[in-house]
């Protein structure tokens, strides 16, 4: 077994066929087929099933793929550790997170990061927790800023901030005259919430269950930027992070209220693959988050 065979095996899985893998690696289909046959012969098990020009992983293949990811990640880390020094001249950093985090918290961090490291190429991907975690595990994203908790047996998680969730409504809503609401005020009130599956939605659902609120969820959205205009026109109220409505509150287009006696918070954390050595661009943004996070407005005045 050699690295080239593992590279071919991984390319087949990612490309979906021997033909596409050959195109990606610039080798013939027959050469790839021959190497996979040798690999399976050496392992003594079948790792790929061929059917109608498609390939599927066997259980042994799934195990091998997991270790392939680890092997190539370790090699990449080794090369980085050997070649990098403390001065970043060039490189890239891939960041992922939820829409509210990427819209309202991350820009301040990235502006300062770019000022300090202008030659680092930055890529930002938005998504809910599960897709972002999958991208981190597949080495498609270097770092995620996610609502905690997350399943972390293979990940490094550093809690960075706790932000308050508030009830948000149109200024014309009957509840908008108050700065604090009781739990009972939420009973049967039309709610527009984040979609199921997001960690922020889970926090809200747990609060609803614990307080025995009769929830009237009329809509669910994946994007806070869609939720806000629906609330603005009076379709319902919502529960979202305060940081996402700072501008609207200042402009008077949305009103917010706390829940009396039951403040609702979500914790955000930095999520990365466990590794012996963090690439310098990744080290720098972790440090920057810790430096700047206290300067960001995430709690109501």
Q: Where do the protein language model's features map onto the residues?
A:
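Short helix-boundary/capping micro-motifs
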Residues: 11-28
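Conserved amphipathic alpha-helical core elements
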Residues: 39-40, 113
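A short LG(V/I)-centered, amphipathic sequence patch enriched
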Residues: 40-59
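Central regulatory/effector-binding core of bacterial HTH transcription factors
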Residues: 90-153, 214
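A late-sequence structural motif
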Residues: 105, 255-298
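Hydrophobic hinge/microswitch elements
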Residues: 128-141, 146-147, 200-255
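Beta-alpha-beta core module
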Residues: 152-159, 163, 178, 225-274
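Secondary-structure junction motif
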Residues: 176, 190-211, 278-287, 292-301
């Amino acid at each position: 077994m050699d690295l080239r065979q593992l590279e071919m095996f991984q390319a087949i899985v990612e490309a979906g066929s021997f033909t596409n893998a050959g195109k990606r690696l610039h080798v013939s289909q027959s050469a790839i087929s021959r190497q996979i046959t040798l690999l399976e012969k050496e392992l003594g098990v079948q790792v790929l099933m061929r059917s109608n020009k498609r390939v599927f992983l066997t259980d042994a293949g799934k195990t091998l793929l997991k270790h392939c990811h680890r092997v190539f990640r370790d090699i990449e880390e080794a090369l980085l550790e050997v070649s990098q020094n403390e001065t970043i001249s060039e490189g890239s950093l891939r960041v992922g997170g939820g829409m509210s985090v990427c819209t309202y918290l991350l820009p301040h961090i990235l502006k300062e990061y770019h000022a300090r490291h202008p030659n680092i190429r930055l890529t930002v991907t938005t998504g809910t927790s599960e897709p972002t975690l999958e991208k981190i595990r597949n080495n498609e994203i270097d770092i995620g800023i996610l609502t905690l908790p997350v399943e972390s047996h293979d990940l490094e998680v550093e809690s960075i901030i706790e932000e308050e969730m508030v009830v948000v409504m149109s200024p014309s809503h009957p509840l908008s005259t108050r700065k604090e609401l009781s739990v009972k005020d939420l009973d049967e009130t039309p709610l527009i919430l984040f979609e199921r599956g997001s960690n922020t939605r889970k926090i809200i659902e747990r609060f609803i269950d614990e307080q025995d609120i009769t929830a009237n969820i009329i809509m669910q959205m994946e994007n806070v930027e869609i939720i806000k205009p629906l609330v603005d026109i009076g379709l319902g109220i919502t529960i979202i992070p305060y940081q996402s409505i700072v501008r609207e509150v200042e402009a008077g287009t949305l009103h917010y209220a706390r829940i009396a006696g039951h403040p609702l918070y979500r914790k955000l954390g930095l999520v990365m693959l466990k590794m012996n050595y963090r690439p310098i661009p990744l080290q720098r943004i972790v440090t920057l988050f810790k430096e700047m996070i206290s300067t960001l407005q995430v709690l109501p005045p």
